[in-house]
Amino acid sequence: MIIPVGDKTIELNAVDGNIGVLLSGGMDSLLLLTLLCDNFDRQRYVIFTIDKADGSTRWTEKILDYISERFPTNEFYQQIIKGGDQDEKKELGVSGKAGFADVLINYYDNLGILYSGNTMNPPTYFWHNTDAPLRGAAVAAAEKFEKFVTPFAHLDKSYTVKLAHDNLYEHVFKMSHSCTERPRGRCGVCWQCNERQWGFDQNKLMDPGKN
């Protein structure tokens, strides 16, 4: 199915078999999971979370409690994946390189499709104290692995904020955690904190989230 967002569109597809979703606890992966559940009923979702220092497992546990109650006719199974070293997280943005490789090696063949909420970086510079993620690696992986899909790869954060806002997905803002430097709250100066704020600023919206 095709979903419009501003001057662009995204495409989502249900398949026979398990639907895999990489869920980091961040805004974009939560938005993607919500869109899938909202549009495809009675599916079996296998949720992969890379266990990293940013508190990913803590936030995704709360997210899945909420999502499973909101969409009770779907089935959800979470698989916690060991992440790689701290310097690997920039390789794929929302996923550690080692953790993503684990998913491909051990789970990919049993999935009908594997979704990632990976987005493109904003077309601007803002001051930050951490490296910007090299998100092109996820695009390259999608070209190599047929069932690995990145429907947001052509969108930056301004579009995903708009998509969540237009669909009244307030929980996407309130429950997600974007900061990579603190497992709770926000440092306000890392690249991901700045990216998130930029997305809201482009839409002239206030961010209701505090995680």
Task: State what each model feature region is.
Residues 1-211:
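Nucleotide-activated chemistry modules centered on ATP-dependent adenylation/adenylyltransferase
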